[in-house]
Amino acid sequence: GGTNYIGDVGRTNFVLPNSLVGGALLKWNRSPRHAFRFSLLYAEINADDADSNDPRRASRGYSFSNTIAEASLGIEFNFWSFDLHEGHPQSTPYLYTGITYFRADHLLLSADFPNGELENQGANWDFAIPVVFGYKESITRHIVGALEVGVRYTFTDNLDGSWPEEIFGNRMPRREFGNRNTNDWYVFTGVNFTFSWGR
């Protein structure tokens, strides 16, 4: 699949994948209407003010890249009954939510920042709330394919290096930028395939 970021650098499009994401997921189908789900995903996020339609960002000229490694656990709710035991093709829209724990790099605007250069300040471990909308369909009795779009609302505003207070615990106005009242988001868009066993 693909991923994009929504925050204080670059474009603000909700779904506009610009880098790859990969991973694995495990589901436990508890009923035809819900399943427990665990996933591991790895992706790179990046953004560039030069791509923004906002003239203020375009003239500022900042850019960044970061890596996301996440584990997510939660519940997937089927809008319609989805039971592979039925013996005929199954399909349904679904919603997934739960809790995500992820690792990214802590970034900091360089002290000498005429070009908006960023310094890596180590690992940033934090939580996010995943909200995933998808549509799945049985391909065979044991294989299910799905298309989904999933947003992660994070509890950090520093995926892009805009909020150094999260690193040092105090304000650093000369190294801050963007909107301090909103946290960063990242979005995964793609397809997945699950294989059932024990039936």
Where are these regions (language model features)?
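Short glycine/proline- and aromatic-enriched beta-strand/turn motifs that initiate or cap beta-hairpins
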Residues: G1-K27, H106, F188-R199
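Extracellular loop and loop/strand-boundary signature of outer-membrane beta-barrel proteins
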Residues: I6-T12, R56-F64, N115-Q121, E176-N179
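Flexible, surface-exposed loop regions and adjacent strand-edge segments
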Residues: T12-L16, S52-S59, A111-E117, S162-R171
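Residues that define the transmembrane beta-barrel architecture of outer-membrane proteins
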Residues: L16-L20, T67-A71, S91, Q121-I129, ...
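Residues on the lipid-exposed face of transmembrane beta-strands in outer-membrane beta-barrel proteins
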Residues: A24-W28, L73-F77, T97-Y101, V131-E137, ...
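Strand-connecting loop/turn motifs
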Residues: N29-R33, Q90-T92, T140-H142
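Gram-negative (and chloroplast) outer-membrane scaffold detector with strong preference
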Residues: H34-A111, F195-W197
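Predominantly the C-terminal beta-signal and adjacent terminal strand-loop region
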Residues: S138-R199
